[in-house]
Amino acid sequence: MLTDLLSRHKQEFLPGLHTELRAQCSRTRGVSFVSGNLMGNTRQDTSGVCCRVYKNGVYGFSSAAEYDDENVKNVIRAAGENAEFMDSRVRKGRPAFPAIPYSSRMTDAHINEVSQKTYIDYLKALDDYIVGKYPNLASRTLMMREDSMEKLLVTSDGVDSHFAAPRSYIYVILSALTPAGVPVELFKAYGGRGSFDMNFSDPAELYGEIDRLYESVMKKREGVYADAGVKTVILGSELAGMIAHEAVGHTVEADLVLGGSVAGPNLGKQVASPIVSLTDFANEAFGETAPLPVYVDDEGTPAVDAPLIKDGILVGYMNSRETAERFGMKPQGNARAFAFSDEPLIRMRNTAVHPGKDKIEDMIASIDDGYYLVNTNNGQADTTGEFMFGVTEGYEIKHGKLGRAILDTTVSGVAFEMLKTVDMISDKVEWTSSGFCGKKQPMPVGMGGPEMRCKIMIGGR
């Protein structure tokens, strides 16, 4: 864990200027098998220190790849000089940020080192199980990834934070051939918050999950193409989370609002069905710890929930301290940086649609001709809210019952229009948190939601 070398250098901050001093250690561990062959075996650690100084509307930033007292002094000095230089040239003349009351947050997470052999042996046991029980698969891929970001932060406002965020996942991809000889595959991630040894102890614990994934692949190999057009569908939790993050979340990040996103003219207006609410959660959601909790952001702002849509009305944005001043809002802890050499950007944390009151069985029974879209493997949206997502697992709904699996397809639409068609929401939320958001810097995020019944454009053959 990082040793605090920062606190002793607070007296070197330039008087009267907002200063953020951050040390960081980021680590990744990875192993991958493809059809029984070890294809990847990696370990990486990066660490360093950075400082950012705000003066009259401009920032000075400096970072160093070695974390020691000399480099701490150097980045404080260089960031201050850069801020002074920028201010002398740009002269924005903006006021100082309101002070954040003193706060201290010490980490309660632990990062436990595990040998690469442990990762390899675990995946090898899973691979042996798959090939022994399911020899008819066309291919199989297993990957393990563990990563963590540990940060020490002190600011001129008196914020003092030490935070560690380890997470670990195993990814399984199973592929089979259709009767026509065309490969189809399904992907599933297992794991979550915590080091590898906290989430995975016995490979046999995943055998049941792999069995269920295999059964789904076998259904998909007999699948049919969806009928193209606007259909009544049930979006599974993964797709609801993708909508929340990609199609809505990015449009309500305040820096993108300033860039002209669709959320700008829609603040305070109806953008979804009255039964839809959506929040970017800081560290707790629906009575439980969020998948990737954030307690203090990299500007030193204490993290609190950011309500975005309430009862169908767009009620807020996600902000940095600077954009919060611009919009007359309160910062809620959304400014985060990926590496020690990165400046904080407005980022999502754990973004989800709130659960409703409906049972998934009743939702399926309510549809005479439609689809249940379970999983997605990719998606993109622009700042107008227009989106297109891939669907890798889905099923027909015929006369209120689940039917045949469907082959890979896509769904598309405009978020604020599609969300107005939501008329049923299930009472259970599921999360995904195994990937990264790619907005300029990669960033671990959580996203999720309940199943939602809506109308959406679906692709066909």
Identify the meaning behind each predicted range.
Residues M1-R461:
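N-terminal small-residue-enriched
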